[in-house]
Each structure stands twice: as C-alpha cells, then as structure tokens.
Swiss-Prot record:
Present with 1340 molecules/cell in log phase SD medium. It comes from Saccharomyces cerevisiae (strain ATCC 204508 / S288c) (Baker's yeast). The gene is RPI1. It is found in: Nucleus. This is Negative RAS protein regulator protein. The lineage of its organism: Eukaryota, Fungi, Dikarya, Ascomycota, Saccharomycotina. One of its GO terms (cellular component) is nucleus.
Length: 407
C-alpha cells in the first residue's frame, strides 16, 4: 500500500526531469502540499497526478514586460548619450580656418619680431616665442590664436614657401631636367602676389629644423684683396690730412686767444669791472660741439699732484704745460706698415681701429685747449681777488696798530 502511494511520486519526478530538458523555461511547483485525495480505483492521488504548470500566456507577458523594460531603459540610455554628446560638441571649441589676411598678419608679426630668437628665454623653450607671437598678433591685429596654433600654422606656411620659390624647390628635388633648372633662373619676384612675396621673405629669413624655428645669419660680403686695400688706404690718408689741418687751425686759434688774454690783463685798471677776457676766451660753441666721452676708457692725463702744482704756479705763466707723454706728442696718426701680414688683417677692422684712435686724439687735443683756457681764467680771477683784498688787508693792519698804541 505504501509502495503504491510512492509510485506516482516517482513518475512525477521523472516527468519533471524530461520536461526540464525539453523546456528550459519550465519550473514545476514542488511546494504543493500532499493531500488525502486518494483514488482507490486507480490507486493514485489526483493532486499529485495533475501538477501545476505555469501558463504560456503568463510567461509571454513576463517576457514581453522584460523586453519592454529593457527597450525602455535602452532608449533612455540612448537619449542620455545623445544629449551628452550634443552638449560636449557644443562645448568643444571649433578651430577656425586661417584666411589670407590672417596669414599676412601672422607672417608680418613674425618678421617684425624675429630678433626675439636671439634671446635665450625665447629660444629655449620655443614655446615662449610662440606665446609672445600670439599675444602680439591679438594686440595688433585682433586675431586670437594660441601658441600651438601659431606653431602649426608656421609649419604649413613654411612648406608653402618651399613651393613658391623655385630655387628652393630645385634644391630639394635632386632629379630635375636641365630645362627646369634653366626656367628657374627666369624667376621674377615682381610678378608675385603679396602673400607669395611674404612667403619668400619667410623662407629667406628663417629655417625650420625638427620643429624649431631658427633665425638665419646675415651674410656679409667679403671685399676683394686687390682693389679694396688701395681704396681704403687712400681714404685713410685723406682723412689724416684733413684732421691735421683741423688741428693746426685749432692751435692757431688757441694762440690768438692767449694773446688776447695777455693784452686784457695788462690794460685792466678798474678792479671791480667785469673781466672781458673771460667772454673772449670761452668758446661756448666749441664746448657744445664736443662729443661725449667715456671717462672709463680715457686715460687720466692730469693727476691730482700735477693739478696742485699748476694751481700754485705764478700768474705770469698763463699757458698750461702738460707733462711729456708719447700719447700727446703724437701729431700724426699711426701709419701701419703694408706688408704680407697687413693683407691678412681684415681692412674693416683696421680702419675702425684707426678711426677710433684718431677721434680720441682729436677730442683730447680739444680738451687740452679748454683746460688751458679755464686755467687762465682761474689765474686771472685769483689775481683780481688778491688786488681787491689788498687794501682791505692794509686797512685792517693799520687799525690794529692804532688800537694797540692807544691802549
């Protein structure tokens, strides 16, 4: 009896295993309680024979609801992604294209500020140079570009300049025919537009190596050894003759001024009158016309001891006598020997040195004349001061003697 009761239960377990294999979504409800509905004819329980099976309609509805929920969530996510992409694209800065007026302003700014590359702070790192260029571009022309955009645009313009100038183009391409090389010689810069002309100037001024802009050095023309030395020497000797004539004229004028001073000192009787020799001896035009001298580079030709000796000298010696020196005794400029070594020396350097020494010699001669004039004025003023104080001194001594005699 007990075995007959358990037989349907075992059959039910076998059926559930087969159904689960065939239908993966099927899940039998094993939580139903075992009741006493026992059929004596069949020997089985009705509640156990007919198990509860989930209806397909419910499963379909659940699957539909799950799919709908998934689809709704997916649509929401897509909308959120679209909104985020649109907001990020609107917030992203759009790079404007460079137009020709902006390119012209950019090249002009670089050409005008090319000397910044000679300073270390703008060359290392190069980023400082492009920051300065972008700042000047905005201040002068109103175009707002950052340093990275300026660097990239220069690279593009430099490659364009290689295509504009045919001589540069021929250097890069090694395989060219002779006809193309001959056509490059007929290059006419007057036929270029303003933009093309600026590109050629950009190519001639800068070089672009490994992302760094380098300022090209200015080329200096070397003179010929045959004709230039003779011309320079002739020009040098002409200048020497002119300078000697000027020195002689200045010496003659100095002698005339000293003679006038002596005459005025002999004929001056009124002690309290204004000395006229001071006005005649001082030449204000000569003082203003002298160039400014650098005292650090000039040798001191009057020492303090010599100045004290000169100040204590008698009033008769009205001309300043400078100490003997080979520098002041030189009346002719230095003449360099012309030999094989002279040809090796650069003529520009030699003429610069000669001109420098000649100008120094002329200025020192003019200063000597001025010092002589000032020394003469000081001596004349000291002489007049002594004459003015002499009667006062005599009066004071006589009064003191009378006072002593009375008392």
């Amino acid at each position: 009896m007990y075995l007959e009761y358990l037989q349907p239960k075992l059959n039910l377990m076998d059926e559930s295993s087969t159904i689960s294999k065939n239908f993966p979504d099927y899940s039998p409800n094993l939580n139903t309680p075992i009741t006493s509905n026992f059929n004596e004819e069949t020997g089985s329980d009705c509640s156990l024979v007919t198990p509860r099976i989930i209806s397909s309609s419910n499963s379909n509805s659940n699957s539909n609801s799950n799919s709908n929920s998934n689809s709704n969530s997916g649509s929401i996510d897509e909308n959120e992604l679209n909104n985020s992409n649109s907001s990020s694209s609107s917030a992203r800065q759009i790079r404007k294209k460079w137009k020709e007026p902006e390119d012209i302003a950019f090249i002009t700014t670089i050409m005008n500020n090319s000397q910044l590359l000679t300073f270390v702070e703008y060359f290392k790192p190069m980023k400082n140079f492009w920051k300065k260029i972008s700042k000047i571009l905005f201040q002068q022309y109103g175009y707002e570009r950052n340093s990275r955009q300026c660097h990239d645009r220069f690279k593009v313009l430099y490659t364009k300049s290689l295509k504009v100038h045919p001589s540069k183009k021929s250097k890069q391409k090694k395989k060219k025919s002779k006809q193309e090389a001959g056509s490059n010689l007929n290059f006419d810069p007057s036929k270029l537009s303003r933009m093309q002309y600026l590109l050629v100037q950009l190519q001639n001024t800068f070089s672009f190596v490994n992302g760094n802009i380098i300022l090209k050095s200015q080329k200096t023309l070397k003179p010929n050894k045959n004709g230039t030395n003779d011309n320079i020497n002739n020009h040098y000797y002409n200048n020497c003759n002119n300078n000697n004539n000027n020195i002689n004229n200045s010496n003659n004028s100095n002698n005339n001024n000293s003679n006038n001073i002596n005459r005025n000192s002999n004929h001056s009787t009124n002690v309290f009158s204004t000395p006229e020799h001071i006005q005649s001896s001082i030449n204000l035009d000569k003082l203003e016309s002298l160039p400014a001298l650098d005292t650090k580079g000039e040798p001191s030709f009057i020492s303090p001891a010599q100045f004290s000796l000169l100040s204590s000298a008698p009033a008769d010696n009205l001309i300043l006598q400078t100490p003997p020196s080979p520098f002041f005794q030189q009346t002719m400029p230095i003449q360099l020997p012309r030999d094989a070594q002279q040809e090796q020396i650069s003529p520009v350097f030699s003429t610069d040195v000669i001109y420098m020494w000649q100008t120094m010699f002329n200025t020192i001669e003019n200063l000597k004349e001025q010092v002589n004039c000032l020394k003469n004025e000081v001596k004349q003023l000291n002489h007049k001061f002594y004459q003015q104080n002499k009667p006062l001194h005599n009066m004071s001594t006589s009064d003191s003697e009378n006072f002593m005699q009375q008392h």
